[in-house]
Amino acid sequence: QMCIRDRAHGIRDGILADLGCGTGELTLMLTQAGYDMIGIDQSEEMLCVVRDKAEQLGLSGRLLLLRQDLLKLDLYGTIRAAVSTFDTFNHIPDLDTAIANAGFFMEKGGVFLFDMNTPYKHRNVLGDNAFTFEEEDAACVWRNHYDAANRRVEITVDIDYHETGEHFHEQFCEYTYDLDTIR
């Protein structure tokens, strides 16, 4: 919120889009701060979580949620700014198209704030490493395989919930982009 208002060319109003909004934490925080928000995600499950949270906070009528692939972004008008967090753009195989799509709907002088994992993190931190996390109610094993030829990290996450015996398994990949490509 402060980054947009104070540091990002003074964006104090207008429509903002949260690209890859996930469970909507940032979308809802910016809505509460008075911004007109569009939360965009390709997962209907994630958008349902945002809807439920918005309803609990009394924000249902103050934001628009769209199920869209960022490689096929289609908005009804322009936006003043876009935000994208939690390495959303590392999950997209065609970064140029995704950024161009966001830019197409951006007002002149608009701002795009996003974070990404760096090539260093993909190679040296995630690499071919595995991480384990143990909590009172669950255990998580996070495995990585760095595929240098295809410039991506293949990630497998397994979570076991002790009390219920439930098991969660997910596989996905993050693509590696050099800073020159991002600029």
Where are the regions a protein language model picked out?
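Class I SAM-dependent methyltransferase SAM/SAH-binding core
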Residues: 27-72
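Conserved SAM/SAH-binding loop
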Residues: 23
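Glycine-rich helix-loop-beta junction characteristic of Rossmann-like nucleotide cofactor-binding loops
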Residues: 6-11, 73
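SAM-dependent methyltransferase
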Residues: 108, 113-183
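Short, small-residue-biased leader/transition segments that mark boundaries at the very start
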Residues: 2-4
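A short glycine-rich, Lys/Arg-flanked "PGG" loop and its adjoining helix->strand segment in the class I
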Residues: 96-108
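Conserved class I S-adenosyl-L-methionine
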Residues: 13-20
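A short acidic, Gly/Pro-enriched loop at the edge of an enzyme's catalytic core
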Residues: 74-81
